Amino acid sequence: MDLVAFEDVAVNFTQEEWSLLDPSQKNLYREVMQETLRNLASIGEKWKDQNIEDQYKNPRNNLRSLLGERVDENTEENHCGETSSQIPDDTLNKKTSPGVKSCESSVCGEVFVGHSSLNRHIRADTAHKPSEYQEYGQEPYKCQQRKKAFRCHPSFQMQEKAHTGEKLYDCKECGKTFISHSSIQRHMIMHNGDGTYKCKFCGKACPCLSIYLIHERVHTGEKPYKCKQCGKAFSYSTSLQIHERTHTGEKPYECKECGKAFGSPNSLYEHRRTHTGEKPYECKQCGKAFRWFHSFQIHERTHSEEKAYECTKCGKAFKCPSYLCRHEVTHSGKKPCECKQCGKALSYLNFQRHMKMHTRMRPYKCKTVEKPLILPVRFEDMKELTLERNLMNASTVVKPSIVPVPFTIMKGLTLERNPMNVSSVVKPSFLPLPFDIMKGLTLERNRMSVSNVGKPSDLPHTFKCMEGLTLKRNPMNVSSVVKPSFFPLPFDIMKGLTLERNPMSVSNVGKPSHLPHTFKCMKGLTLESNCMNLNNVKKPLDLSETFKFMKRHTLERNPIRNMEKHSTISLPFKYMQQCTEDRMPMNVKSVTKHSYLPRSFEYMQEHTLERNPMNVRNAEKRSIIFLLCVYTKGCTLERNHINVRIVGKHSVCLVPFVDIKGLTLE
């Protein structure tokens, strides 16, 4: 039958753990160890109660050197006196087994059973000084990186593994790594629940009392280890040692592949995964693998939506501790980030924005414009702005153009919009364009297309209700004008105007013609109706005709073809709703001086493609056109209410239409 060794049943404490025990626990420990020694037949060393506290006051001593070892019968030393007699034990009142050899220390005179016990005791007496105990044939194990000496080779091997980052044993449940097999065995007891000491708070089982006491600090928040330099407290002695290296700058753990040094072995071990590409932590739900355990823990909370870190002041919960630390700064009012260039203290988010001011970093650049463009544009509500929008596209500009554009609500702006397209401008152009509600602006819109302009043009246009303006509308088409023309065109309600209607087509006019035409009920005007066809007239013609019921007059109407003087035309349209495409409110090709057009867009909801309300190309003098459209809802394509091609002087035509409801196509 094999004898039981003391290593199999002994429980060891570190210096920090022994200091945490109260006197009753220390007395209990002494009694248990004494009873254990009495029951072991292979132990013959003297037991002294007073040496227990001395052992834990001296961290270099091993408890087993005070309690004894198994008898080493195979080795002999010259300084040991061999004896076959039984060694009396005053404390245990027992005799050792026959044939036990005793060894006496030459330093202090104590007698030990076995050479290994004596050798450990000599190291304790000489305090790890190799010059004093080399005579006994013992070579100390020194670490070349930290210059630390070890008593036995296994401890030295563990230290070497720590420096190289080699950890052979990983816990699959919590991700911790261990150097020795015994360490992971003790650790697995906590997960399996086989330990004798169970935590009152969480129910975890600990294999021994020392681990149980250390585990309790997680719940109690006890931090007995304080840094002498900064006063920071820690729960574990190893954490304090790693923290002290931040003050000294010591980084003993170096990576062999890249040469990077670290202050703790765990940091080195995790760093090695960047070279090997190892990702040991895999999510069971989605299969995603992670290199670090804390990243794996944060990822698992995305599936469970668990927020384990809660703010003590406001109760807000977070998924990871880094978010909680940033949140706690908002309560304390501290600004941890300080700018090294200007010394300004900022929060984490504002610090990143602040550093761009010093570095002059501009990550957002326009691909089409080389020079910077300054536009004071105020957007109150912009929700769905998308790609490639150029609110002002200026290709060749000599002087800057300042365009204040306040947009109250802009929800649906889309791609490639150019409200103002200026190709070649010599002087700045000032265009106040207030848009209250713009919801449906779409692609390729050019509200003002100016190709060649000598001086600035101020164009205020008032449109109260424009809901259905469509493509290519030209209510007034003036090709060549020598003097300005004044056309007050009030449109009350425009409902049914359709394509290609020319109520008055004046080609060549010498003198004015006054034609008051009253159409009370015109519902069904049809095609090719020419009530008055005058080809060549030199003097004015006064025609007062009352048409009470004209229902089927249609398009291609030319009441006046050729005249030499002005024609004054006032066209009030009460009900005009369906004006359609090809409308140009003012088409002037060549302009030398200013053109003033006041614009007010109150409700523009469905503006569509290729609209040019003002196309000014060639004109010699100013054209002042005031267009008041009260309700224009359904304007349609290619309408030219006034088609004046060659005019020498002003044309004034007064034609009141009371009810025009059913004008139709061609």
Swiss-Prot record:
Its main location: nucleus. Disulfide bonds: none annotated. The keyword Zinc-finger applies. It is found in: Nucleus. InterPro entries: KRAB, KRAB_dom_sf, Znf_C2H2-type, Znf_C2H2_sf, Znf_C2H2_type. CDD domains: KRAB_A-box (cd07765). Residues 4-86 form the KRAB domain. SUPFAM superfamilies: beta-beta-alpha zinc fingers, KRAB domain (Kruppel-associated box). GO terms for biological process: regulation of transcription by RNA polymerase II. A zinc finger (C2H2-type) spans 101-125, 141-163, 169-191, 197-219, 225-247, 253-275, 281-303, 309-331, 337-358. One of its GO terms (molecular function) is RNA polymerase II transcription regulatory region sequence-specific DNA binding. It holds the Pfam family KRAB. Gene3D superfamilies: 6.10.140.140, Classic Zinc Finger (3.30.160.60). GO terms for cellular component: nucleus. Keywords: DNA-binding, Metal-binding, Nucleus, Repeat, Transcription, Transcription regulation, Zinc, Zinc-finger. Residues 73-101 are annotated as: Disordered. May be involved in transcriptional regulation. Belongs to the krueppel C2H2-type zinc-finger protein family. This is Zinc finger protein 844. The lineage of its organism: Eukaryota, Metazoa, Chordata, Craniata, Vertebrata.
